[in-house]
Amino acid sequence: MSQVYNFSAGPAMLPIQVLRQMQDELLEYEDVKASIMEISHRSTDFIAMAQKSEQDLRDLMNIPNHYKVLFLQGGASAQFSMVPINLLHGKTKANYAYTGHWSKKAIVEGSRYCDVNICTNSSDNKYTDIDVFENWDIDPDGAYLHYTPNETIAGLEFDYVPEVDMPLVADMSSSILSREVDVSKYGVIYAGAQKNIGIAGLTVVIVREDLMGSVVANQPILFDYTIQAKNDSMYNTPSTYSWYVASRVFEWLKQQGGLSVIAKINQTKAKTLYDVIDGSNFYSNPVALKYRSWMNVPFLLADENLNGLFVEKAAINNLITLKGHRSVGGMRASIYNAMPQKGINELINFMKVFEKENS
């Protein structure tokens, strides 16, 4: 089978080494004589895998001991509810940065639990720029500040971490594990797994212990961080296979040399692609230079009538899932950790040929 490069925004490409390991272990996990999908989450074998996966993630991200790591369900969308449920602590306000599609979803859900103060808004520039932090309108009475470091659809990414005197909450679904992060700056970090962690069905939540223990009344017990932590993320049956895949991805990341190495690779991949876009009169990217995403690279064709042909011919060349989101148009190359430099090179070669044939 020819190598296919999948530029999907999520569920996304997995490392080929992990896919082969999944294939090898599908029918029999290690010495268990059964698939990991078939064994109890209470078994010693599954618990050993779960504990190792947590430790590997702690090692990769240098997570301090006073943070809990949870492996939950419901995707990032469930966290849009769980964050206010667990972090309001009796307050009635919270700060949210509005920089794109996913932060808007968090705002809509957060407003069901509290008064949302939108402290910065990128909708006026169509999510192509982020205001400097000094211009943000932070409500000091807010329980926390929520932001989305990387907006998957627009390809808009922060190049700074907001510094506030309140818990900082980050939806890192599309940027987690792409580089080193100082976890101690955050109260909560959460991420759906299907981009840089593994496959859909799992959500990783990293929460500072002192923020746990007080929840909005009359909410589902599964939405209580404290309950989940006390039960090692197994109050109910977890998404066992998704957890297993994440464990294999964590191992793969460590084998690559950790996040400092991965960050350099990711930065090089993104720069290589942006350089081609910027050096062309045929392709363009509207995002402000300093806020361009490493993970999601949208680009427009000079003639939008060629979009369908581009996607069709790219697929023939084993470059799939390049169609941009309907709200942006054009193309989008999502180049998460699993995408090798060779995949970027193949895309660039195709782009150059397509431009030559259609200019």
Curated annotation (Swiss-Prot):
Binding residues for L-glutamate: 42
Record-listed E.C. numbers: 2.6.1.52
UniProt enzyme class: transferase
Subunit structure: Homodimer.
Name used for this protein in its record: Phosphoserine aminotransferase
Sections of the chain in a coiled coil: none
SUPFAM superfamilies reported for this sequence: PLP-dependent transferases
Single GO term (MF): O-phospho-L-serine:2-oxoglutarate aminotransferase activity
Cofactor(s) it depends on: pyridoxal 5'-phosphate
Pathway connected to this protein: Amino-acid biosynthesis; L-serine biosynthesis; L-serine from 3-phospho-D-glycerate: step 2/3; Cofactor biosynthesis; pyridoxine 5'-phosphate biosynthesis; pyridoxine 5'-phosphate from D-erythrose 4-phosphate: step 3/5
Gene: serC
Known function: Catalyzes the reversible conversion of 3-phosphohydroxypyruvate to phosphoserine and of 3-hydroxy-2-oxo-4-phosphonooxybutanoate to phosphohydroxythreonine.
Main location: cytoplasm
Subcellular location: Cytoplasm
Record GO cellular component, one term: cytoplasm
Catalytic activity annotation: O-phospho-L-serine + 2-oxoglutarate = 3-phosphooxypyruvate + L-glutamate; 4-(phosphooxy)-L-threonine + 2-oxoglutarate = (R)-3-hydroxy-2-oxo-4-phosphooxybutanoate + L-glutamate
Record InterPro entries: Aminotrans_V_dom, Aminotrans_V_PyrdxlP_BS, Pser_aminoTfrase, PyrdxlP-dep_Trfase, PyrdxlP-dep_Trfase_major, PyrdxlP-dep_Trfase_small
